[in-house]
Curated annotation (Swiss-Prot):
It holds the Pfam family Mito_carr. The gene is UCP2. This is Dicarboxylate carrier SLC25A8. Keywords: Membrane, Mitochondrion, Mitochondrion inner membrane, Repeat, Transmembrane, Transmembrane helix, Transport. Inhibited by pyridoxal- 5'-phosphate, bathophenanthroline, tannic acid, bromocresol purple, butylmalonate and phenylsuccinate. Proton conductance is activated by cardiolipin and long-chain free fatty acids and inhibited by purine nucleotides ATP and ADP. Chloride ion transporter activity is inhibited by long-chain free fatty acids. Changing residue 268 to G: Found in a patient with congenital hyperinsulinism; markedly decreases transporter activity. The GDP-binding domain is located within the hydrophilic cavity, with GDP phosphates likely forming salt bridges with the charged residues, Lys-141 and Arg-185. The long-chain fatty acid-binding domain consists of an hydrophobic groove between peripheral transmembrane helices 1 and 6 near the matrix side.
Length: 309
């Protein structure tokens, strides 16, 4: 047995809720530079936007983007928007991941045997609900990641300043910009990520290929990360472009997608695929492994407090 030993008592909804948010924050701290590189690659080629990289900066590949940013803007630029990112994960992941099992049980009416349909419904529900809660934090995170420190200066000086500036210049709706593509993206991501993780893990356990331990969690999380990236990349690129667009640049998320297709071709929808996969794959591994261990650790702590002797 590697890691914390599973307890006889299943984790409570509160443990899952807190564990998911904490695990997601840990994963973000480790993989945030890859996410920033992904955003820069995704917005490259846009004609305009409220914040954008310097005109001379051309990003090529994951490492090329990271090295260019470090050279032109300094190492700290890789963590632009980290505060908003952590705020997002505590509210976002807690809902979409922490409530997944509870919603799945609701759709299966308490049955232990969940069908793929009920898992997909649960993933869509918690993914969409999480967006409703955390959208402003996502907008601020993307804006921070998109802006360059070199050149014309930074538009947003702090996380609080970003919230205030967006609300003042673009109205309250500015903080909820891109909600539609984000709902679509996260319904898709949640279904692909959580359902795939569930299915791979169940298959490995049923076939007795692995035990419910770290290697099983690692393998399931990595597979889920790849499947999710392939499925969600197009809507993720549209979401990022639309969130970072200037007021009036696109009339809707659909208009943004159509403009991308006309001006840049279908390959534009997979811009930043490699950093997306590296980020999502590594993020999934860190998050799911940490989440599984946190659930066991928290339940062990609760059990020991209730029965100290």
């Amino acid at each position: 047995m590697v890691g914390f030993k599973a307890t006889d008592v299943p984790p409570t909804a509160t443990v899952k809720f807190l564990g998911a948010g904490t695990a997601a924050c840990i994963a973000d701290l480790i993989t945030f530079p890859l996410d920033t590189a992904k955003v820069r690659l995704q917005i490259q080629g846009e004609s305009q936007g409220p914040v954008r990289a310097t005109a001379s900066a051309q990003y090529r590949g994951v490492m090329g983007t990271i090295l260019t940013m470090v050279r032109t803007e300094g190492p700290r630029s890789l963590y632009n928007g980290l505060v908003a990112g952590l705020q997002r994960q505590m509210s976002f992941a807690s809902v979409r991941i922490g409530l997944y099992d509870s919603v799945k049980q609701f759709y299966t009416k308490g049955s232990e045997h969940a069908s793929i349909g009920s898992r997909l419904l649960a993933g869509s529900t918690t993914g969409a609900l999480a967006v409703a809660v955390a959208q402003p934090t996502d907008v601020v995170k993307v804006r921070f990641q998109a802006q360059a420190r070199a050149g014309g200066g930074r538009r947003y000086q702090s996380t609080v300043n970003a919230y205030k500036t967006i609300a003042r210049e673009e109205g309250f709706r500015g903080l909820w910009k891109g909600t539609s593509p984000n709902v679509a993206r996260n319904a898709i991501v949640n279904c692909a990520e959580l359902v795939t993780y569930d299915l791979i893990k169940d298959a490995l356990l049923k076939a007795n290929l692995m035990t419910d331990d770290l290697p099983c969690h690692f393998t399931s999380a990595f597979g889920a990360g790849f499947c999710t990236t392939v499925i969600a990349s197009p809507v993720d690129v549209v979401k990022t472009r639309y969130m970072n667009s200037a007021l009036g640049q696109y009339s809707s998320a659909g208009h943004c997608a159509l403009t991308m297709l006309q001006k840049e071709g279908p390959r534009a929808f997979y811009k930043g695929f490699m950093p997306s996969f590296l980020r999502l794959g590594s993020w999934n591994v860190v998050m799911f492994v940490t989440y599984e261990q946190l659930k066991r650790a928290l339940m062990a702590a609760c059990t020991s407090r209730e029965a100290p002797f």
